Design a protein with these regions (language model features):
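Glycine-centered loop/turn positions within well-structured domains
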Residues: 42, 143-144, 270, 296
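Canonical Radical SAM [4Fe-4S] cluster-binding loop centered on the CxxxCxxC motif
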Residues: 25-64
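N-terminal [4Fe-4S]-dependent radical SAM core
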Residues: 1-33, 43, 75, 248-260, ...
Length: 347
């Protein structure tokens, strides 16, 4: 083989390796969910055990390792990255990771899901580093109830201040609320009014069975349909076109009020058919689907001298094996007792 032909062959191999990342059902990965840490300063019952056992620090990927995987995925067509945890802001200097990711040419947005506790100090730094939006988990608008849900005292006002500070520095803010029957389902209209008053998007999430405290049951699930009926009785809604691959169906208020309502119906109406996400856990596991028990350990390659092509092959193999969806699991209740609680997967 001549040198020229060898180069052409190498270029062709490179082109194939970094082609769009497709699974066996034709779904193309465009979004990365990156868990920065499994640690969190809150103890929400649907996410975190009361007495969690943290991953050893030496098992957690460095920012450079996370950045390298993100760069490889960007070459394979991923354009949007969302940082999660645990709580991403408990990890020191996380704005350095934000800057690394936002500097990747192919990446269009770097956003973060956070409990908001550290936003009063961090919002400005995150914005300057290139963060393009935050989603704040806010599971009650009643201070005492909120603090009971998160298992921490005197934190509600600080979270609300964090939302204000993020907006002050120009970070678009969405609010996530997990609705649980008998806990906060009487606040659905209060959250709708929050959206109307502030112009924010409030996203109602169905209660999923990845709870660290094993409290999930079908009876506690409030469906997206029930949430929408409750809101529509007081504030009629108009559905907006759903973006392909979106986890949420978004609605505007029919009377033209500010703000939007969204529902994420992972349990009653999964969006698996056009799911475009791939997940990387803080300890380096590729998780093709939130509900899947299959994990593919990337850390040995990252720390064993593997080149980008080898890592790309590994990722392609893992993503190819993504299963069709959660319908079968939902029908047979195989999702109960998931191997990982939510704080170790990244929401």
């Amino acid at each position: 083989v001549t040198k020229t032909n060898a180069c052409l062959c190498d270029e062709r191999t490179d082109e194939l390796l970094f082609a769009p990342l497709v699974d066996r059902f034709g779904r193309v990965a465009k979004k990365l969910r990156l868990s920065v840490t499994d640690r969190c300063n809150f103890r929400c019952h649907f996410c975190m055990p009361l007495n969690p056992v943290w991953l050893p620090k030496e098992q957690i990927l460095t920012y450079e390792e996370m950045g390298r995987v993100a760069q490889i995925l960007a070459r394979m067509g991923v354009t949007k990255i969302r940082l999660s945890g645990g709580e991403p802001l408990v990890r020191r200097d996380v704005e350095r990771l934000v800057a690394m990711l936002s500097a990747i040419p192919e990446v269009e947005s770097v956003t973060m899901t956070t409990n908001g506790f550290f936003l009063p100090e961090m919002a400005e730094r995150l914005k300057k580093a290139g963060l393009t939006g935050v989603t704040v988990s806010l599971h009650s608008l009643k201070p005492d109830r909120f603090e009971g849900i998160v298992g921490r005292k005197e934190v509600f006002d600080r979270v609300m201040a964090g939302i204000q500070k993020a907006r002050q520095f120009g970070l678009p803010v969405k609010v996530n609320v997990v609705i649980t029957r008998g806990c906060n389902d009487d606040e659905i209209l209060d959250f709708a009014e929050l959206a109307r008053r502030t112009g924010m998007t409030v996203r109602f999430i169905e209660y999923m069975p990845f709870d660290g405290q094993k409290l999930w049951s079908p009876e506690r699930l409030v469906s997206g349909d029930e949430i929408l009926r409750t809101i529509n009785r007081h504030f009629p809604l108009v559905a907006l076109p759903r973006e392909p691959g979106s986890t949420a169906q978004v609605y505007r208020f029919a009377d033209g009020a500010l703000g939007e309502i969204a529902v994420i119906t992972s349990m009653t109406m999964p969006f698996c058919h056009d799911c475009d996400r791939i997940r990387l856990t803080a300890d380096g596991k590729i998780v093709p689907c939130l509900f899947s028990k299959d994990e593919y350990d990337l850390r040995p390659l990252l720390r064993g001298g593997a080149d980008d092509a080898t890592i790309a092959r590994f990722i392609r193999h893992a993503f190819w094996r993504k299963f069709s969806g959660v319908a079968t699991l939902l029908e047979t209740a195989q999702y109960v007792g998931h191997v990982r609680p939510m704080h170790t997967i990244g929401g």
